[in-house]
Structures are given as structure tokens and as C-alpha cells.
Design a protein with these regions (language model features):
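N-terminal intrinsically disordered/low-complexity leader segments
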Residues: 1-10
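C-terminal peripheral helix-coil segments that are non-catalytic and often amphipathic
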Residues: 2, 86, 90-94, 123-139, ...
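Helix-turn-helix
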Residues: 14, 18-56, 60
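Amphipathic alpha-helical interaction segments
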Residues: 56, 83-87, 105, 123, ...
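Hydrophobic alpha-helical connector segments
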Residues: 60, 70-100
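Alpha-helical bundle regulatory/interaction domains
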Residues: 76-89, 113-117, 135, 159
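Amphipathic alpha-helical segments used for helix-helix packing
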Residues: 83-84, 94-122
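Hydrophobic/aromatic-rich alpha-helical bundle segments in the mid-to-C-terminal region
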Residues: 115-122, 134-164
């Protein structure tokens, strides 16, 4: 059976999309190949033809997912930034990590990842701070806003009682 010309590109995109959602929901190290290919709707062979290692898949996931977050915050003036932060800190974002920012879910795994993943992550976080600085008008405030927002989501996901 012959595949269409864009088959490999489509399979790669599906693997990154499904891998990002699964990794943010269950953790990257907890995401097995079988679950990943099932969620992506591709064969096991597709993953091995697209990525030389699981670390390479992590790099692709970090780049795609964090780039989306950077894009969501880019060009937002103070009022717009407040709306985006309100969404970021919302119960919906906390309850559905698969559809949100990768930092609260994957930050601790990135800290244990290879140097390439960490450098990629660091560069994208700096871009995120650059984007936040537009709305905060001060770099230190942008870093504080980022840290507090991520911490808020991590805590919201970790505690059982919403009144805590």
C-alpha cells in the first residue's frame, strides 16, 4: 500500500500533537510508545521513522508546546495580558493540562532532561518573558508573573481541596 506524499509529515505532526497532550496530562516519562501511537492514530513504525529516540520526541514536544504558549502571550498589552493570565490561572486550565501550557506539567522533567532539551526550553522561556515584558513594562515583573502563574497552576493541580 502506497502512502500519500505528505504521510510522513502528517504522521510526525500527529505524534508531536498526541505526545504533547499525553505528556502534559500524565508526564513524559510515564508516556509509553503504545499509548502514544494509539493516541496519534499511527503505527509503531511511524514513531521510529520520525524520531531517533524518545529524547528527540521530547525536544519536538517542548518546541511545539512552548512555542504555542509564547504565541498566546505575544503582543499583549496590559489589559489583554490580564485576560490571558486569568485564563492561565482558571480552574479549566488547571483541570485540563493536556490543553494548556507545558511548563507546569513538564518543568520538572525538563530539569532532568538532556542539555539540548534544557537549552531549547530555556530559550523559549526567555521568549515568553520577552512577551510578558510587553504587558508588565519591566523584566523583573515579567519573571515574577511567570513564576507566580506557573506556581499557581502547579498548586491548583496538586491539592485535592479547592478551598486549600
Amino acid at each position: 500500500m502506497r502512502y500519500p506524499p505528505d504521510h510522513k509529515t502528517v504522521a510526525r505532526a500527529k505524534l508531536i500533537e498526541a505526545g504533547g497532550a499525553l505528556a502534559k496530562k500524565a508526564g513524559f516519562s510515564n508516556t509509553g510508545i503504545d499509548a502514544l501511537v494509539a493516541a496519534a492514530g499511527v503505527t509503531t513504525g511511524a514513531i521510529y521513522s520520525q524520531f531517533r529516540s524518545k529524547a528527540e520526541l521530547l525536544h519536538a514536544i517542548v518546541e511545539r508546546e512552548l512555542s504555542r504558549t509564547v504565541e498566546a502571550f505575544t503582543g499583549k498589552a496590559s489589559k489583554e495580558l490580564q485576560r490571558v493570565i486569568a485564563w492561565y490561572l482558571s480552574p479549566r486550565h488547571a483541570a485540563h493540562p493536556e490543553g494548556g501550557c507545558p511548563i507546569p506539567s513538564l518543568g520538572s522533567e525538563i530539569a532532568r532532561a538532556d542539555e539540548e532539551a534544557r537549552l531549547l526550553f530555556e530559550g523559549l522561556v526567555k521568549q515568553l518573558v520577552d512577551a510578558l515584558e510587553v504587558g508588565t513594562a519591566e523584566r523583573s515583573k515579567a519573571w515574577a508573573l511567570l513564576a507566580q502563574s506557573i506556581g499557581g497552576v502547579v498548586l491548583a493541580r496538586a491539592v485535592l481541596n479547592s478551598e486549600t
